[in-house]
Design a protein with these regions (language model features):
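Short hydrophobic targeting helices and cationic amphipathic motifs
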Residues: 13-16, 34
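Terminal targeting signals and extreme-terminal segments of soluble enzymes
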Residues: 33-299
């Protein structure tokens, strides 16, 4: 429990129209000035170093959730290190991440081949930091095979485009990393919306323009939203993701705009834990990723 407590992030979900407390003066700085001091995602990834038996990276404060890396970034870094250590991997099909402790300080990421078959490759990847083991993950890569099956039951939400939706990341004291993303609320509710269902559909994109077919970029973005259960919250509260499981539905997703629609739905929230599902949609209406997440909620 000590490690979980150390990785908590407090979501202070007060709208920007409310008076700003003196303790969060940084939000008085114009957004353009804030971004000029931030590390673009592409620069962050380029800073990963190869060592004898692992890859290492130190995170700038603007990419942190409290004092630790948030789950989506940790997942993305594990995938990047896995690709660098294993050439010619087929597309990522599935991954399971267990967030054991806070990802703080200099991070070392080691990937180990578990099994290589004719079409499927399994890799185990661990991330360690100053507090010890931070992430333990298993990644499954698979080449396409001929199949007589072509079916999917997911139905894309009928929502307006991002240009016609209001801004999403407009609350004070949100985690530092949220400033790296542009968000537009397409459906559902903002956190701390009294009486609303705990679900939201939000258009998301990186402020840093890059290769939008990159699964590493998509993983970092797919976990950018707060848990859908925080729609039910009445006060700010710390949260900590415990596990994150993803299934990739499009081997090579394409995107010409940079926008992805994240549809997050809380299934249950009780006894201090929330279970939710998130579906990531491409702008042309294709489901590209489905994720399940278990979150500890301290409030």
């Amino acid at each position: 429990m000590d490690r979980i407590v150390a990785s908590r992030c407090r979501y202070d979900l007060v709208h920007l129209t409310n008076p700003l407390p003196r303790t969060i003066k940084a939000w008085r700085v114009p957004i353009d000035n804030q971004r000029s001091k931030m590390t673009p995602f592409s620069t962050l990834i380029d800073g990963m170093q190869q060592n004898v038996d692992c890859h290492s990276i130190s995170l700038p404060t603007d990419w942190l959730q409290g004092r630790t890396a948030y789950g989506g970034l940790s997942a993305a870094l594990c995938l990047e290190a896995t690709h660098r250590g294993n050439e010619n991997l087929p597309p990522l099909r599935s991954a399971q991440y267990c967030f054991v402790g806070p990802a703080t300080g200099n991070l070392n990421i080691s990937a180990q081949m578990l099994r290589k078959g004719k079409s499927t490759t399994l890799v185990g990847c661990d991330m360690t930091g100053d507090s010890g083991l931070a992430v333990r993950s298993t990644l499954c890569f698979g080449a396409s095979r001929p199949s007589s099956h072509h079916y999917q039951s997911l139905v894309k939400p009928q929502v307006a485009g991002p240009d016609d939706c209001p801004a999403y990341f407009n609350w004070t004291a949100s985690p530092s990393f949220a400033r790296h993303f542009d968000g537009r609320l397409a459906a559902g509710a903002m956190p701390r919306t009294n009486g609303a269902k705990p679900e939201m559909s939000v258009w998301l994109r990186h402020h840093d323009i890059g290769d939008e077919t990159s699964m590493v970029r998509l993983l970092a973005l797919a976990d950018a939203l707060p848990p859908a259960a925080l729609v039910l919250a009445t006060d700010p509260m710390p949260i900590s993701t415990l596990t994150w499981s993803i299934d990739v539905l499009e081997a090579y997703p394409s995107n010409s705009t940079g926008w992805w629609l994240a549809q997050a739905t809380c299934d249950t929230s009780r006894e201090g834990y929330s279970a939710q599902e998130t579906v990531i949609w491409s702008p042309d209406g294709k489901p590209v990723l489905v994720a399940r997440q278990n979150v500890a909620i301290f409030g």
